[in-house]
């Protein structure tokens, strides 16, 4: 995450480690430079930020000057706020193009998405409270980790509140972290209890 005066920016990544590290390293170098061509400080809005990050990603994964080497590709999610503008969240693809959240789909995912997506599709709405949205994200991670052993902790949880221009909460959760362990158990127990209340088939009465 990056927070300075008039802006707070959070960047997530998945994909090729070399490309992701190159992007993060170049972003830091541009921030430290006295006269950068572009940096997170000079971008006027999140479209410019997404284009800047996309350009860096494309530079690293573009091995022949024309096409992106998919083995070197990384995806990024960038979110946050610039003073005087609304909060933003965007997904940046390896070729440098990007999309933003919408009313129809007010969330974005990186990495292994299929196991945790159903809960997000069912529950995430724009009117959801920040706390409920965070719990939903953790349940999504929990579902993914139960179905795919290649996905595991730590889970880095970052909370940004609109117009604060700083990270209000930052946690790193493990399986045995009391809060996460309690959340995981209650979600599993709740699903089992709810499953027992589902309607019966007519033919079950014959058994």
Predicted region positions:
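N-terminal nucleophile
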Residues: 1-207
